[in-house]
Amino acid sequence: IAAGTEDTYRGEIDLSTPFNESGSVRGRLVGAKERRGDTMDLYKKKRDVLYGIIEADVAEATTVSVGGSVQRTRPSGISWGGLPALDADGKPIDWPKGQAMGAKWSRWDTDSHEYFAQVEHGFANGWNARLSYTRLENTFNAPLLFTSDVPVTIDGFSSAPLLRKFKGGSDQDVYGGSMDGGFDAFGRRHQFNLGFSHSVINAWNQSWDTSDQATYPIPDVKHWTGDWPTPNWDILALSQTHRDKQTGVYGTLRLGLTDSLHLLTGARWTRWESTETSGGVTGYSHTYSEVTPYVGLTYDLNDTYTAYVSYTNIFQPQMVKTRDWSMAGPAYGHNYEAGVKASYLDGRLNASVAVFQTDQKDVAEYGGYDYAHDDGWYYILDGTRTRGFEAELAGEVMPGWNVFLGYTYRQSKDNAGKKVQTTQPEQLLKLSTAYRLPGAWNKLTVGGGVRWQSQTSAQTYYGLQSGSIVQKPYALFDLMAQYNFSDKTQVQLNVRNLADKKYYRSMGFYNSVFYGEGRSALVTLTQRF
């Protein structure tokens, strides 16, 4: 069980048990219930989760498992879009902490159901085979209020907010199978894997407007309480259906060329079919297929260090519209990576460094809003190149002292040398540590961490004003303490964003910004039986 700031409460139970004396039939049941607020005004969330699985060894080397999960999420007081980033003069707005522009009735309710089954068989020669099926069913209902317009001043908006209700869902069937094992050839041991996947998604969505829109006043920003009249959703604005079908066949081969040198190679064939209808009329129908190869080499320099290089093709379907409202095609590209991995202290401490380069073409980048179609459009970049490197150190440096240190640098540019994907930081640094005190205090573990990122920015759109939305570099600090009363009972305190830093966690959506969560604390009691 857990309790924390902002009226946060959570309870979870996890039960596992055999159903017979031999343990050949066993099950697990997990249930969780969460109620929480937020440092953002008005926002609250309820979430209930139930998960169960039964496994049965139906033969000496054959296991069958079936299960499912249900998740119900009820957030309320949410905002459709963030807070306007700039005023009418193009100057950044310094919103008060916790400022929100949702209505008390605005929400995004979701219900998810998952059902799955798998059969796994181990052959006498050491090979394994699996067949699986998963069914996913999702629905959502979201009456929302949108205020990411341009404020005339901090006192009010230039127009009344936009109100819209979204409703929809999707059903997905996923089939999969794989076989893997080892074989001997040329005096060495090798590994092979072969598999397939097939999925079909049928989705639908509707949006509703209200005839009450024109009667609503311009909101008072400074004294916003969320007490906005509940609309009468009486105008069907959009009704669409989508059908996506993806089929893939893949294989990988790991060859032991020498005692120290290994070759990993493989390929995946993907076929993607997508169809959209709007108002009963087919809006688009596309079919793409592609083979994406992969090849990599690893070389054991000694017992501590292993060097590697790898190359893979990229094929990424993009479900977005271009400026002329045609469907964007897939993005294609290549990824190259090289690095060194190390294992110290008998495997308790691991480190790695790597450099990478990703070249892509036909990448969709957000361009603006199309009022005629009531949706966003994207322009297609002729080419982008992302270069960077990353380093990581993780593990136990001394008895009872664990550390994690990770640093990533990446920069993306188009063919003209202009930076793109600027809403993502070029630099990320993560550091965390936990230390279990020695001697009489060995039941207590203390730790903390810091998350730092470099500057991010987004361009404004829609011709409202020119300029950039900028988030300067910032760092977030966290603390934790854990006390073990026994091997089965422990209590833990986590404090996130210790300094209560005010920052944008994302930006650019309809010229808006989303603030990150402020300081929060959570106490968790865990009891095992």
Predicted region positions:
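Face-selective signature of the C-terminal outer-membrane beta-barrel domain
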Residues: 115-138, 161-278
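Gram-negative outer-membrane beta-barrel transporters
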Residues: 259-260, 357-359, 379-461, 499, ...
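Repeated loop/turn-to-beta-strand initiation elements of outer-membrane beta-barrel proteins
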Residues: 23-25, 61-64, 126-129, 187, ...
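Acidic/polar loop-and-plug regions of large Gram-negative outer-membrane beta-barrel proteins
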Residues: 34-38, 53-122, 137-170, 214-238, ...
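C-terminal beta-signal and adjacent terminal beta-strands/loops
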Residues: 359, 452-461, 482-529
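Outer-membrane beta-barrel translocator/receptor signature
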Residues: 1-52, 58-62, 113, 349
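Structural signature of Gram-negative outer-membrane beta-barrels, strongest in the C-terminal barrel
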Residues: 55-59, 63, 170, 187-201, ...
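Membrane-embedded beta-barrel scaffold of Gram-negative outer-membrane proteins
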Residues: 17, 118-134, 138-146, 307, ...
